[in-house]
Amino acid sequence: MAATSRAGGEDRPAALRRIPEATVARLPIYLRSLYELSAADVTTVSSEGLADLCGVNAAKVRKDLSHLGSYGTRGVGYDVGVLLSQISRELGLTQDWPIAIVGLGNLGHALANYRGFGARGFRVVGLFDADPARIGELIDGVPVRHVDDLPAVARATPIAIGIIAVPGHVAQLVADRLVDAGVLSILNFAPAVITVPERVSLRKVDLSIELQILSFYSQRLAAGGEATA
């Protein structure tokens, strides 16, 4: 499903550049710091300054931004407003992306109430659960529908991104339903490995894995070692 442009076709990337996945993963981190700088009325930032804010080294910042065609000005740095626009455009944040959340337990409910989605162009258009007690509940103006209604909702309001926040044992079933409904991008919070067709983009967020990684570094710190990855 194609997203809706928020400000006309000129907001789309000029070309589909080949950008390394590691660089793509850092762009939202740069963007967050740039928003903070902009809110503080800072108009320019050096690669060193941006690197300090983001916890990376300056050479990596310069290399990452060069993939966007942004090289900054020697002795001045990067224009914060221009860089904000470049990264937002590259990440597709100048378009509206309709999203659906399946699973309205504690995590799903929190995601549905998160106001930060709208500020980045992610519009919640569907909320789904299998619990009869939740059906009909309004969350930020969006009604919770039964998961069986997913195909009908997707036909009426195409969904670009589906978020899975269900128990692990039903995650694959939910993923299959999203794919069957025409959803081509899925973010999986469920503690399970799921498979999707090659045409579908899948991202996995596993909080337990992140905690185990932190446990590894905490153990090293306690033993007097280095904490940095």
Label the model's feature ranges.
Residues 44, 48, 53-99:
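HTH-adjacent hinge/linker in prokaryotic transcriptional regulators
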Residues 1-43:
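Extreme N-terminal segment that seeds HTH/winged-HTH DNA-binding domains in transcriptional regulators
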Residues 118-140:
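NAD(P)-binding Rossmann-fold cofactor-contacting core
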